[in-house]
């Protein structure tokens, strides 16, 4: 019988040996060491020969599970970063079009607060490209902060002016000696006529 590869030959030998071990209880044919086998095949062979204790088997399964979990977590982290990047780019595009929804404004403010310390820590960067990006981010943050400050200041001034005008209209604010629309009491026009 001709085999197409060494691995197929090793597999067929292993299956025949297993068959003999199950049929004939006294025979145990050891596989030849010349054939290469995978780590799982070696592990299964050791378990079959009962060289591993229960604790060692649990430990091996625990290590395997930890590796799988690590890969899954890395994949999830990459997906999470990608989704955040997409969300940020969408919000950035809406901001440039001045079409931000309240939820997007809230998310942007949260992102600014979250990354403010990172910008401070990254102030000493040697790479000019990264430095340019950081400077752009700083100017964007300052513009947002100044815009917020300017809007609140304008609102306060408008409210103050409105309140002052309302008080004048109601007559709450009055100056002694002045009558609305008339000259002050005791004012002589004689000095102007001379």
From Swiss-Prot:
The protein's matches in InterPro entries, at most eight in alphabetical order, are given as: Rrt14
Of the GO CC terms on this record, one is:
nucleolus
- Keyword set for this entry? Nucleus, Transcription, Transcription regulation
Primary location: nucleus
Task: List locations, semicolon-separated.
Answer: Nucleus, Nucleolus
Similarity section: Belongs to the RRT14 family.
Outline what the protein does: Involved in ribosome biogenesis, probably through modulation of rDNA transcription.
Q: What is this protein called?
A: Regulator of rDNA transcription 14
Native species: Clavispora lusitaniae (strain ATCC 42720) (Yeast)
Q: Which gene encodes it?
A: RRT14
